[in-house]
Every structure is written in C-alpha cells, then in structure tokens.
Amino acid sequence: MASTTPTYIDPAPPVSKSARSTGRAGDKIFAGLSKGSGILLLVIMASIAVFLTYRASIALSKNEGNFLTTFDWNASANPPVFGIAVLLFGTVVSSIIAMAIAVPIAVGIALFISHYAPRKLAAPLAYVVDLLAAVPSIIYGIWGALFLVPQLNGLNLWLDEYLGWTYVFDKTQVGVARSLFTVGILLAIMILPIVTSVSREVFLQVPRMNEEAALALGATRWEVIRMSVLPFGRSGVISASMLGLGRALGETMAVATVLSPSFLISLHVLNPGGGTFAQNIAAKFDEANEFGRDALIASGLVLFLLTLLVNGAARLIIARRKDFSGANA
C-alpha cells in the first residue's frame, strides 16, 4: 500500500506592526476626509441659505406689495413694490413645457441607443449626446435668438390656426416668437442630453437574464422593454428628469437671450413676454441699487427653495418606488 506524504504549506507571513498601523492610518485619513467633505457640503448649503434669508428679509421688511401675488417689480420706487407672481408663473410654465417635450424624446433616444441601435452606431450617437450636454448656455441662447425664434414664427401661426380653440395656443398678441413657449422648447433642447445620458446608463444596467428570459418565453422586443426595461429603470428616469428640471428652473443666459421680458401673466403661451426668476435677476442685478439687489436676492431665495422642494419630492418618489418594489420582490 502506497504511503502518502502530507504536503507542508508555509503559513502566511505575519503582518508587521508597521504595515498594520500604516493601513489603519490610511483608513482613518480616508474616513476623516470623507466625513469632512460631507460636513463641508452641509456648511456650504447652510451658508447659502442663511445669506439668502438675511438679505431677503431686509427687502421684504420694506416691501409695500404682497411678495407672492404682486405682478409689478419696482424695487427702486418709494415706497418699493415688487412681487414674484409673474416670475413664478413663467418659471413653472416654461419648465413644464420643457419637461413635456424633452422627457419622452430623451427616453426614446436612450432606448434606441441601449437596445435597438447597432454597436457601430450606438457608440458615436452616445458620444454626440454627451457632447451636447457640454455646450455652454450662451451658445444655445444665441442659436435660439438667431435661428429658433424666426423658425417658430410659422409654427406659432399654425398652432394658433388649428389649436387656438384650446385657449393655451390662442395667440392674442402680435409679435415675434419670444414667448414662454419658445423658452420651453429651447430649454427642452438643452436638458435633452442630460436626461438621455442618465436614462441610457440606467437602461444598460437592466439584468441581461431578465431580458433573455422574457425573449425565451416568446416576448417581442417591445414587450421586453415595456415589462422589464422600463419598470427597472423607472427610478433612474425620474432622477434624470429631476436633473433636467433643475437646469430648466435655473437657466439664465439662454432664457434672457430669447425671452422678451414683461410683467404680465397670460395662459396664452404663444404671446410674447413673460419672465423667470433667473432671467429677471440677470437682467436687473447690475443696474440695481443695494436695496434692489436685496429684492432680487429675495426672488433668488424662492428659486433656491423651489429647487430643493423639487429634488426632495423626487427623492421621496424614488424611495417609495424602491420600497414598493422591495415589498413585491
């Protein structure tokens, strides 16, 4: 009977105290830097909020009008009268138009790149989309003022003729297409690359086994997307949409270049005129006196709070959907 000789395995060399202490020191340094970065972010946010609140309180204490409902903006008058009704309306309406146009198109482009386009086409198309996200706002503004506005004059006439009965597209004022509708279209073009890029990456994370299982059961490509890809990426699409909405709410130069500002509220979105928070601040800040700047900062505080509210609502929606998905897993 053959005897077997046990193989002797050398134990792992002991870790020296110096190496162990170096590793622990590195962990402590990294943990400290991470914690410090988080605290720094909170400090920056808090300092911005405190600064805006302090400067806004100075202006609001002397405002003779209702800050939320006054249509006029005359902070240099004696007594000063100013309000954000027109600015809030214009910001919300233009952002809604932008989201209504951009999100469906962005999701369609993202699905095409991730699930339909051949690889030779998907890679350059994704690169072009990412490149569009890096175009400066002022370039979009110049293009919108010199090209988009003249082109939309004909579209406005068509909408007025065939959809004017909806009241929203009833154009009651004569003028070029420097309206909230034009601003919404321009903002949609600007946020389209952001929503597309994030949605595309989310759709690419769908487990391959889920798609293959659905195809093996006889599902068509569209059924796979409808029953597997879209439900999986719903939270990501919401996050992408909120990123786009954040840019639409705070966009300044492009809106200021395209829009004809006026302090009027009209549901006729094709009529020229209107205003947004960012556009009004950019247009008036340099020429305003100290009190006028405080008034503009007060409107900036509202925009700051509006952005926080939108992002908070988006996070709440995403969290609830994740909890619902986990409960039904």
Stretches with model-predicted labels:
Residues 14-33, 53-98, 118, 173, ...:
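Periplasmic/extracellular loop-to-transmembrane helix junction in inner-membrane transport proteins
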Residues 98-129, 314-323:
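Transmembrane-helix boundary motif in ABC transporter permease subunits
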